[in-house]
Amino acid sequence: MDFDEGDVEHDPASLEELLERGLKVVPVTIWGDEVVIGFNPKELSRLFGLSGEVAVADLSTMIEKYETVLEAACRATRQLPPDHMDWECPERKRTLGRFTFHIFDRPERALNAYNVGMYSSEDRGRNFKDVLGSVGFEEIARYGEEVLSRVKSALGGPSPLDLDKVLDTYMGTKTANELMDLALGHSVHHLKQLYEYMAQSGIKPVDPLGEADFQGITVPTELF
């Protein structure tokens, strides 16, 4: 399938095209007059007429994968030297401090959306300094541990989430199950990117996850 790829962070023309359409979030897929916001496998399959079911992790798998992924992200975050907090990620134009925080904040915002009934575009890009203050990687990792504890309690506690609950999001309506699954895939994708950034800095991750650990989680095929 032929397509045009736009990079709004490095290509002003691509950014201008989105703004002219009234779009202020990425990623976004435009096909004719239709727009799909975010990495949304269900809507992308519908848009392009793709056959087959879009996998969404079941409850037990989701709990297991969240624990595996967020614990690995905490390990990797703790390995980063303090002088890397302001290192700018080449493809993302955001600091490594903000990037690592983002790995953990997306699941937290998904849980928050369950309580307030809405997941906004502002939820997807919070700055760690607005939430945690001027902290380092250790504090971000501790935040990740707190988020994991909340996720496990919400999914596997005595009063688990109603995963069929419908929520309003900037991507359209989603069930709580879909939103938690998307947040999990988002954390996986960014963990893979973090491993690449660590490699660029000559840092070898401790007990890194491999593809087998990511089985059953839907993520984009391209690293960036």
Please place each PLM-identified region on the residue numbering.
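A short, structured beta-strand/loop element
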Residues: E17-L23, N112
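Non-globular targeting/processing and membrane-anchoring segments
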Residues: G6, E43-A113, R126, K165-L167
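C-terminal structural segments of small proteins and small subunits
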Residues: E34-V36, N40-R46
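A short, hydrophobic beta-strand/beta-hairpin element that forms part of a small beta-sheet core
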Residues: V25-I37
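Small-residue-biased structural context
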Residues: L70, R78, S149, S201, ...
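Short, contiguous alpha-helical
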Residues: H84-K129, D168-F224
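Thiol-based oxidoreductase modules, predominantly thioredoxin-like and allied folds used
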Residues: M1-S14, V25
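Acidic/histidine-rich alpha-helical segments that form the ligand environment
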Residues: Y66, L70-A76, V131-L167, K174-Q193
